[in-house]
Amino acid sequence: MLRDGNEGMSTIPGFNQIQFEGFCRFIDQGLTEELHKFPKIEDTDQEIEFQLFVETYQLVEPLIKERDAVYESLTYSSELYVPAGLIWKTSRDMQEQTVFIGNIPLMNSLGTSIVNGIYRIVINQILQSPGIYYRSELDHNGISVYTGTIISDWGGRSELEIDRKARIWARVSRKQKISILVPSSAMGSNLREILDNVCYPEIFLSFPNDKEKKKFGSKENAILEFYQQFACVGGDPIFSESLCKELQKKFFQQRCELGRIGRRNMNRRLNLDIPQNNIFLLPRDVLAAADHLIGMKFGMGTLDDMNHLKNKRIRSVADLLQDQFGLALVRLENVVRGTICGAIRHKLIPTPHNLVTSTPLTTTYESFFGLHPLSQVLDRTNPLTQIVHGRKSSYLGPGGLTGRTASFRIRDIHPSHYGRICPIDTSEGINVGLIGSLAIHARIGHWGSIESPFYEIYERSKEVQMVYLSPSRDEYYMVAAGNSLALNQGIQEEQVVPARYRQEFLTIAWEQIHLRSIFPFQYFSIGASLIPFIEHNDANRALMSSNMQRQAVPLSRSEKCIVGTGLEHQAALDSGVSVIAEHEGKIIYTETNKIVFSGNGDTISIPLVMYQRSNKNTCMHQNPQVQRGKCIKKGQILAGGASTVGGELALGKNILVAYMPWEGYNSEDAVLISERLVYGDIYTSFHIRKYEIKTHVTSQGPERITKEIPHLEANLLRNLDKNGIVMLGSWIETGDILVGKLTPQTAKESSYAPEDRLLRAILGIQVSTTRETCLKLPIGGRGRVIDVRWIQKKGGSSYNPETIRVYISQKREIKVGDKVAGRHGNKGIISKILPRQDMPYLQDGRPVDMVFNPLGVPSRMNVGQIFECSLGLAGDLLDRHYRIAPFDERYEQEASRKLVFPELYEASKQTANPWVFEPEYPGKSRIFDGRTGDPFEQPVIMGKSYILKLIHQVDDKIHGRSSGHYALVTQQPLRGRAKQGGQRVGEMEVWALEGFGVAHISQEMLTYKSDHIRARQEVLGTTIIGGTILNPEDAPESFRLLIRELRSLALELNHFLVSEKNFQINRKEA
């Protein structure tokens, strides 16, 4: 139980703190622990000994900056140097040198690592904690069978089972079960020691017969029996030292390694006092586990809940990096051992520099960050996405679960999750419940458990202390919920309050309360904490909102929300998109790309991000927010980033919405918008695409970047400079050349037809020795070139080619087909853009900006959007911003309604507009049809809502083709927008054509215009020379494909012609 220093006060910890603490723990402890495990290495003759002196290792500051690493596609890492010594045992001479072990990727201020120029982040994994767990299952006869499962540190399982006759069996890796006395004897205990150290010796002596007693009468017999069962070998193995070593290596060192966490859990569960440094399974553990299992059979003890968080552990970034570092050192050990033996064999004098190479460590970390499932590319769609990504927790990954095998019970919410893992924020689809998000106050403890803070309540004292509790501790306390979440400490507590105790929710007297929650948002993640009035929403819609806020596109002109929750400031601050003053000073001058200020006697220049592309093609940009000559304080915002205004998160826009049907254009989650959102650039966003080309050295020669491209129109090359690269500021259309490149090819005259060679000889045309492989702008990529980067190769190696990257910016207004969403799970697709004069308008003449379907509210139970809409209207008229904590119903009933209506009433009084608050239908107003000027029949809910534009945009999804590529084997059109793919006319489309009786059109769709190869060619020739298009005689390729697939299933499909005269069957070949 840990106490915080500030009594009675709590601040929200940094959202990136978990990543920072994990990496610091790896640097401070993990590196040293693994280096101390590095053994002394000797040659085969034991004449030379190599060892590392790990006490004085050094990590060197990186030579490049973060921006340069991203720009040049390098890894932002630190070099690790360790003193090493080589000792000649015969002469007692020692040669000591500081050797370079390798590069360790560092963590930047965002909690991420830069590997090969890409921001990557390591997410936390939730695993079953090592130890022993008891459970009960019913067999086929309906009788309870008790088992104890021992889980090792790496995830291996061994089971103890007690049957109906009270016999205890052991099972390793789901193999055949053996008597518990066999592994106990094989681990070094004789029968007398076993009987002296158990509570139920009569049960251990009851079931072995004389034949079985011989198996564990001695340690050798027990080892042979255990090896025969464990290794599944036939015959009678012979006892030997090699057999003991193999068993020791394969079983006792791998499957019986508990680790420090497993040793602690085993001691607590079985009431043992084995030292913490003994991390392997001992015979004493096995006997105590069997004793406890017998007690379970007799009704003593409690079963374990495998889904309780006290039985889980977090595998953080520190553990993963330490595991990889240990793996790299094992590889380095093998390299050093092989190099020493090779040097002695060739009679060379080795040195520590010659023995150690940096390849194992560097390649291990590169493969880890590039291939490991828990190492992911940082999602940088908007600032919220960056900080949420690092707080994810996953049950998936090596040693964990899979999306197809995880049960519903594992995915479900558990009472121990409260205050630790958000019960709302999870992914949708097959991974639902398996990928969660940590609560905002949660932290990872020393033993890998998720801890949550509480206020400790004293009966005789009014002082309050904050304590952090692990899941195994807080279930023994009465934890108050409900009104104990009150922000105001002076509120008089009621006599009876709701509380949580031992995974149950009770209502008890206030005097019995031990702990209380510290914050209303304590149970939620960052995404869920940004939803106002979340208590009025269905949890499924809150889940959708948490995910959709991470998909919001940064707009060209951001606007902070009128109705918020108060966490917007810290979310923007911890995201790192804003520039914060590190100390006091005075601004000397500001430019669009840098801020220069003086402080502490130094002049500091801070570079700003200028139109930087994120990995989701959104635009990251920083704008100075301070003026020349102004004095600044430490912590003040110097420049705002994308989707931030005034240091607060600003993902969307406050626009005027109405909930009403409009000619069916907003049915089924469709949304009707005004053209003001288009022409006023309300939802305009910038997107930056990257196009890349590399030059290689081929077998015919090197590829060339040039402007002189033969056989191409000059119009396509108009934007290239003299080097053949597109110029900055050029406007590029689809099909234009971005980089001109020629690839050499061999010219063989024999490959041409005789008439071609004759024509070339007459006209004097030279055979081309190059082919054009230019970088062309694909469909949908039109825009303005904002940056060109030519990364030159170093050292002239053909394996490190030159790379040219072209960045093109697109300005996208909102259009039909784009996806918009609110913060309450209310999402929709733009169906129509109306002129502003046709939109419904209010009584003061203002036209509505967006029209939602009112039927989408009651069935989905996300009523929070109605409160936000009405309160946003009042805030817009009163020029106020509201920051509302959730669960305000704890103060009184209808608290949210009592908050909104007085604000509407005040806005109505101050603006002299009685329609803002009408007592007959509060929150609603009569609005008018913009086309006719007539009022609608019923009053309509309207107000200001905060609406986001999501990254699912029609420009990235719409696709069509008239002709394109076909698969070579199946002759079917390719699939996907990236391959310029298409679709066949399907079954339902054929039904539609049949319904209209258009037989010829239907035949064309299935033959000429589809995959009938010969018919397609005949149509082309007939169209050129004229004539009648003949009907196809044979089947199209799709029918042939069906026959081939049936043949692959051993089904032969033939067709026959039956004669009408004699009914003889004449077979015709297909």
UniProtKB/Swiss-Prot annotation:
- GO BP field: DNA-templated transcription
Task: Fetch the CDD domains from UniProt.
Answer: RNA_pol_B_RPB2 (cd00653)
Q: Which reaction does it catalyse?
A: RNA(n) + a ribonucleoside 5'-triphosphate = RNA(n+1) + diphosphate
Its GO CC terms? chloroplast; DNA-directed RNA polymerase complex; mitochondrion
- One Pfam family for this entry, by name? RNA_pol_Rpb2_2
Q: Does the keyword Transferase apply?
A: yes
Cellular compartments annotated: Plastid, Chloroplast
* GO MF terms held by the record: DNA binding; DNA-directed RNA polymerase activity; ribonucleoside binding
Q: What is its EC number?
A: 2.7.7.6
Keyword list (alphabetical) reads: Chloroplast, DNA-directed RNA polymerase, Nucleotidyltransferase, Plastid, Transcription, Transferase
- What's the family? Belongs to the RNA polymerase beta chain family.
Q: What does this protein do?
A: DNA-dependent RNA polymerase catalyzes the transcription of DNA into RNA using the four ribonucleoside triphosphates as substrates.
HAMAP family in UniProt: RNApol_bact_RpoB (MF_01321)
Task: Share what the entry says about its subunit structure, partners included.
Answer: In plastids the minimal PEP RNA polymerase catalytic core is composed of four subunits: alpha, beta, beta', and beta''. When a (nuclear-encoded) sigma factor is associated with the core the holoenzyme is formed, which can initiate transcription.
Q: Which NCBIfam families match?
A: PRK00405.1
What name does the UniProt record give this protein?
Answer: DNA-directed RNA polymerase subunit beta
Organism, by scientific name, is Chloranthus spicatus
Q: What is the lineage of its organism?
A: Eukaryota, Viridiplantae, Streptophyta, Embryophyta, Tracheophyta
